[in-house]
Swiss-Prot record:
One of its GO terms (cellular component) is cytosol. It catalyses: shikimate + ATP = 3-phosphoshikimate + ADP + H(+). Keywords: Amino-acid biosynthesis, Aromatic amino acid biosynthesis, ATP-binding, Cytoplasm, Kinase, Magnesium, Metal-binding, Nucleotide-binding, Transferase. Belongs to the shikimate kinase family. Its EC number is 2.7.1.71. It holds the Pfam family SKI. This is Shikimate kinase.
Amino acid sequence: MSVSNVFFVGLMGAGKTTVGRAVARRLDLPFFDSDHEIEARCGVRVPVIFEHEGEMGFRDRETQMIDELTARHGVVVATGGGAVLRPENRAFLRERGTVIYLRANPHDLYLRTRHDKNRPLLQTENPRARLEELHAIRDPLYREVAHFVIETGKPTVAQLVNMVLMQLEVAGIVVPPAASSPTSQVSRQS
């Protein structure tokens, strides 16, 4: 089966890695998480990179990794939440594959990430307010780059995976194994 690339974007805690890994498994494709790949290359966790190189240093590494990963063929990639901040990353993603925006509201994201110390942008006095700020800034960028938007609020991971596969099948991008899924929380982006 010929499959193009599938890229997941969204804020931290939206489920990009979990859903992306499951979609890759169902499509029998290799899966990559851009943050994990950066960590493997550097030999340290993302918070350490932020501490030593600052956010801009990390973003430089991220752009290089996004370029490398999106240049491959037949892969599923979960991007870091801030990958869409740079125009070149948005171009790599939009032009080299199908982009799925896993959208979650800031409250749900806060509940999912509040105990995670590996999220440097949330190590603030008010992480909930920070998530609301990040959502306000990034949501338009995610929508700009996305081919599909999937709301992650209520569905289970299995339902989200089926929703992604259904959208890819309807768009003629893949012919996945039989999967029935709800469609009420999916919207097509032009």
